[in-house]
Amino acid sequence: MTALQSDLISAIRSIPDYPKPGVMFRDITTLLGNPRAFRRAIDELVHPYAGTKVDKVAGIEARGFILGGAIAHQLSAGFIPIRKRGKLPHDTVRIAYSLEYGVDEMEMHRDAVVPGDKVILVDDLIATGGTAEGAAKLLQQMGAEIVAACFIIDLPELGGRRKLEALGVNVRTLIEFEGH
């Protein structure tokens, strides 16, 4: 484990049995509240793409907005919010995606992506990958080229990374936690 990984892990609060028994919730709000850890996480997520053409960063509601906005700023890119259905005010495009216990829908503004835009997809954590897979498919349907999908945390036992890789998306994560 690198010093960076150790620092990030120590900046994340783990809450047992939330939101339900048997789940270990990884709360990044403590990382966000720690200026040094927050900067290091953003810098590390941005580093591989500095000097790469990135037109937009797409953040998945809600923590992906925080991380994605900071990454977009550092890359001088635009930002695309990907939101739950009914939360955006203009003409939207929508996709249904699978959750652990059902189906939900997310959407983005129809004019948020120009075909050929190079986009980085961002969220705080990848677990089963249903939400990230839905967001990636939505971006691809609109003609975006996904440069990468970036997450602070990977829960590898849940297989989300494989879903994105099956779509041809390069996945970048900073730390892993075993279990869920």
UniProtKB/Swiss-Prot annotation:
Record-listed E.C. numbers: 2.4.2.7
Domain of life: Bacteria
UniProt keyword annotations, A-Z: Cytoplasm, Glycosyltransferase, Purine salvage, Transferase
Top-level class of the enzyme under EC nomenclature: transferase
Compartment(s): Cytoplasm
GO terms of biological process kind: adenine salvage; AMP salvage; purine ribonucleoside salvage
The family this protein is said to belong to: Belongs to the purine/pyrimidine phosphoribosyltransferase family.
Role description: Catalyzes a salvage reaction resulting in the formation of AMP, that is energically less costly than de novo synthesis.
The protein's name in its UniProt record: Adenine phosphoribosyltransferase
Lineage: Bacteria, Pseudomonadati, Pseudomonadota, Alphaproteobacteria, Hyphomicrobiales
Gene: apt
